[in-house]
Amino acid sequence: MVTEKTLERINELYHKSKAEGLTDAELAEQKQLRADYVKAFRENLRGQLESIKIKNPDGSLIDVKARHDEKMKRLAEEQAEKGN
């Protein structure tokens, strides 16, 4: 989980890099903090997308994740058939 303190540190390192440059240790810290931030962002986005349901005109609900998984399975099967 990314905290407000982590975001402040990311921004602090960014501004310092533009103003005067970073040490090797600060560059490594910046890289790790950014990687952690991107990972948390992606996990959060994935969680939101997986919980979305689409309502059809007939009133039925479709789970977006299940629909996506079915589509990916179909595409994989089609590619496997083309490969044979």
From Swiss-Prot:
Record carries keyword Oxidoreductase: no
Cell compartments where the protein resides: Cytoplasm
An example Gene Ontology CC term for this record: cytoplasm
InterPro entries: DUF896
Main location: cytoplasm
Pfam families recorded: DUF896
Keywords noted in UniProt: Cytoplasm
Family statement: Belongs to the UPF0291 family.
The protein, known as: UPF0291 protein EUBELI_00985
Species: Lachnospira eligens (strain ATCC 27750 / DSM 3376 / VPI C15-48 / C15-B4) (Eubacterium eligens)
